[in-house]
């Protein structure tokens, strides 16, 4: 297994067929998302010594490209939380019901109403950010594998969120109305942390960032990685945390 940093925001992890076999994985396992695939991603991330600028990212995207003799896993960190003022985002209303087009239109109007003369430039930066990770993966594949037939690319995104108390965790869980591939709940000191894995198959390129923005309405940006939480925290719910917490009725 080899890791290469191809940009400030993207890592490329190459895993041979022998490594896959040793982990009990086959190429077909990546075509239909399942718990086995989730654990594969987590185990790879736990083993690797990630660069410092990746260790504190609250959102990591996984994109898998199977090849004839290996798979390439592209891991991209998002800088969305640094590019958007979350207080301004909260002023936009219920973005969970907005289409992507309405989201950008509302954000632009909010900037203009606040006298932001750079509103259009900021919108362009946000849109470019959402396309950047996908473009990096495409360019890397084209430059290295022009003569090689590609198999369908499958993507996943992994988030970590922080909460001050268990009530906040339950309220967050009850706002989730879209499919979650996997979720875990940890306790570290007085705080709580949740990991979430989403499947990006058949989703538009902006889906991961839009879901991240929606969830940040009810959560704090993650300050720990899953590897750190597994080693230093108490795991309260091992799997399907969202569904289990949704069964709790708040008084």
From Swiss-Prot:
One Pfam family per UniProt: MecA
GO molecular function, one term: protein-macromolecule adaptor activity
UniProt-listed InterPro entries: MecA_C_sf (IPR038471), Neg-reg_MecA (IPR008681)
Entry comment, domain topic: The N-terminal domain probably binds unfolded/aggregated proteins; the C-terminal domain interacts with ClpC.
Subunit structure: Homodimer.
Protein purpose: Enables the recognition and targeting of unfolded and aggregated proteins to the ClpC protease or to other proteins involved in proteolysis.
The family this protein is said to belong to: Belongs to the MecA family.
UniProt name for this protein: Adapter protein MecA
Gene field: mecA
């Amino acid at each position: 297994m080899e890791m290469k940093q191809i940009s400030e925001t993207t890592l490329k992890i190459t895993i041979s067929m022998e490594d896959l076999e040793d982990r009990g994985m086959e190429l077909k396992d990546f075509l239909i998302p399942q718990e086995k695939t989730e654990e594969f991603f987590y185990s790879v991330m736990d083993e690797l010594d990630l660069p410092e600028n990746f260790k504190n990212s609250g959102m990591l995207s996984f994109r898998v490209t199977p090849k004839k003799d290996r798979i390439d896993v592209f891991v991209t960190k998002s800088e969305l939380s640094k590019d958007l003022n979350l207080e301004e985002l909260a002023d936009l209303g219920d973005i969970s019901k907005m289409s992507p087009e309405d989201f950008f239109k509302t954000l632009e109007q909010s900037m203009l109403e606040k006298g932001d003369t750079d509103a259009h430039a900021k919108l362009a930066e946000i849109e470019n950010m959402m396309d950047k990770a996908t473009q990096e993966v495409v360019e890397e594949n084209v430059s290295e594998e022009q003569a090689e037939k590609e198999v369908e690319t499958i993507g996943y995104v992994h988030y970590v969120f922080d909460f001050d108390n268990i009530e906040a965790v339950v309220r967050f869980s009850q706002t989730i109305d879209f499919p979650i591939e996997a979720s875990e709940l940890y306790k570290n000191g007085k705080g709580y942390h949740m990991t979430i894995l989403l499947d990006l198959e058949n989703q538009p390129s902006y889906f991961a960032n839009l879901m991240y923005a929606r969830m940040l309405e009810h959560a704090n940006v993650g300050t720990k990685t899953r590897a750190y939480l597994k080693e230093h925290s108490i795991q309260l719910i091992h799997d399907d945390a969202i569904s289990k917490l949704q069964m709790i009725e708040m008084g």
